[in-house]
From Swiss-Prot:
Belongs to the LDH/MDH superfamily. MDH type 1 family. Pfam families: Ldh_1_C, Ldh_1_N. Gene3D superfamilies: Lactate dehydrogenase/glycoside hydrolase, family 4, C-terminal, NAD(P)-binding Rossmann-like Domain. Keywords: Mitochondrion, NAD, Oxidoreductase, Transit peptide, Tricarboxylic acid cycle. This is Malate dehydrogenase, mitochondrial. NAD(+) binds at G35, A36, G37, G38, G39, I40, G41, D61, N122, M254. It comes from Schizosaccharomyces pombe (strain 972 / ATCC 24843) (Fission yeast). Substrate binds at R109, R115, N147, R181. Homodimer. The keyword ATP-binding does not apply. It catalyses: (S)-malate + NAD(+) = oxaloacetate + NADH + H(+).
Length: 341
């Protein structure tokens, strides 16, 4: 199947399904989900149906999207939902007029696979969708969920450049699940409240490139307990792949994270100030080391990326993690860029 295959201002339920029945007037937007029939796409689409900043929800997939649209279209919120198939210019229709485009399309991980193992299949899918999006809705904000994000976001950039419409502020790699896992897993170790723990996660979105900055979240752990927590955050997806025994990867938690990132982007587009997420964007932070993309805290605005925040003060342990991450990131980014070059 084509489908499977985003801190401080975040209140989980309200952020994803804010005031679904509110009579308060506010600007709403068209959101397109590419890969809406898959394991992530279906629950992601449902969560977006609950968001009062979505006026129109366009669902596309090579199969199943009209059925998903018919199903979630019964949910009693005001947004209109339409599902599109590839025939009769379905992709173009889904993208036409979209303010935000979310891409969870691609194949899922199976036991023993890393995110990077998905490159061979997912790279071409993301490239082709980027071409279509760039030609149809060049001013949209693009949220790439498809793994390996460290490579697919550079692919998306290169494709947009080919079309002549790339705007760095408009392109996001969705790494929100790393932040979600960091707060949840840390709360299990510290007995704190997950929703009150804000752990910045920088770097990338694959294994050792995921660098949780526990020190910035006020978490003081050392030794084996710290190492185990860091490893679990970095490789938490493996738990789900193993538990599902070949039947899929982290689809539901990823849908939640994707909906959170989309909600943050929509809130910023609507004019809300101070909206922040950790996200993988074209960044100046490590360009002097040849690394054009990096995940860090980003303040969102009406034009997408507003402010890219530096990593900030970190301890020696985190510095060592970051050094490893940068080396891996450079290789993954280059791999993606060369795919379209």
């Amino acid at each position: 199947m084509f489908a499977k295959v985003a801190f401080k201002n975040f209140t989980p339920l309200k952020s994803i399904a804010p005031r679904s029945f509110s009579t308060t007037s506010s600007r709403a937007f068209k959101v397109a989900v590419l890969g809406a029939g898959g394991g992530i796409g279906q629950p992601l689409s449902m969560l977006l149906k609950l968001n009062d900043k979505v006026s129109e929800l366009a669902l596309f997939d090579i199969r199943g999207a009209p059925g998903v649209a018919a199903d979630i279209g019964h949910i009693n919120t005001t947004s209109n939902v339409v599902g599109y198939a590839p025939d009769d210019k379905g992709l173009e229709k889904a993208l036409n007029g979209a303010d935000v485009v979310i891409i969870p399309a691609g194949v899922p991980r199976k036991p023993g696979m890393t995110r990077d193992d998905l490159f061979a299949t997912n790279a071409s899918i993301v490239r082709d969708l980027a071409f279509a999006a760039g030609e149809t809705c060049p001013e949209a904000k693009y949220l790439v969920v498809t793994n390996p994000v460290n490579s697919t976001v550079p692919i998306f950039k290169k494709a947009l450049e080919r079309v002549g419409v790339h705007q760095p502020k408009h392109l996001f790699g969705v790494t929100t699940l790393d932040s979600v896992r960091a707060s949840r897993f840390t709360s299990q170790v510290t007995n704190g409240k997950a929703e009150l723990l804000h752990i910045p996660v920088v770097g990338g979105h694959s294994g050792a490139t995921i660098v949780p900055l526990l020190s910035q979240g006020g978490v003081e752990l050392t030794g084996e307990k710290r190492d185990a927590l860091i490893h679990r955050i970095q490789f938490g997806g493996d738990e789900v792949v193993k538990a599902k025994a070949g039947a899929g990867s982290a689809t539901l938690s990823m849908a939640y994270a994707g909906a959170r990132m989309a909600s943050s982007v929509l809130r910023a587009l609507a004019g809300e100030s101070g909206v922040e997420e950790c996200t993988f964007v074209e960044s100046p932070l490590y360009k002097d080391q040849g690394i054009d993309f990096f995940a860090s805290r980003v303040t969102l605005g009406k034009d997408g990326v507003d402010t890219i925040h530096p990593v900030g003060k970190i301890n020696d342990y985190e510095e060592s993690l970051l050094k490893v991450a940068l080396g891996e990131l450079k290789k993954s980014i280059t791999k993606g860029e060369q795919f379209v070059a």
